[in-house]
């Protein structure tokens, strides 16, 4: 009887702990890994009128499979209209695109030229 209760308690601890870990993975903890020099970077394409349209096209080609065509998220992938994305600096978003966050299921897009990553950032910031 005692062994069964211990098993149930341990099971609950594992489920709760796993839930908290999963919740932490998706709550923007990746932002704490962004170096200050990257966080402070400004989008060099901010003033270019075609950057948003170019970024939208790149988003559809590379990101929509996971985040949805309207960037509203799919299954376990986040809605990019969220407060977290609105609050992120352009530098943080470009850093995430470049480095990814495999723990959260976000691949690195370092194979995309830097200009294209910034154009995607322009698009993401336009969603606000």
Question: Could you say what each language-model-derived stretch is?
Answer:
Residues 10-19:
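Bacterial N-terminal signal peptides
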Residues 45, 52-56, 68, 72-98:
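Gly/Gly-Pro-rich "capping" loops immediately C-terminal to redox-active cysteine motifs
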Residues 23-27, 45, 74-81, 98-128:
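Axial heme c-ligation environment in periplasmic c-type cytochrome domains
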Residues 55, 59-69, 120-124:
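The canonical Cys-X-X-Cys-His
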């Amino acid at each position: 009887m005692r062994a069964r209760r211990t098993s149930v308690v341990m099971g609950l601890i594992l489920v709760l702990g796993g839930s908290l870990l999963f919740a932490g993975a998706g709550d923007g903890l990746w932002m704490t890994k962004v170096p200050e020099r990257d966080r402070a970077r400004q989008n060099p394409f901010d003033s270019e009128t075609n950057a948003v349209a170019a970024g939208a096209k790149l988003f559809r080609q590379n990101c929509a499979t996971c985040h949805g065509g309207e960037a509203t998220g799919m299954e376990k992938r986040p809605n990019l209209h969220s407060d977290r994305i609105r609050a992120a600096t352009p530098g943080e978003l470009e850093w995430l695109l470049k480095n990814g966050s495999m723990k959260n299921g976000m691949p690195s897009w370092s194979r995309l030229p830097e200009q294209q990553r910034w154009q995607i950032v322009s698009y993401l910031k336009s969603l606000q």
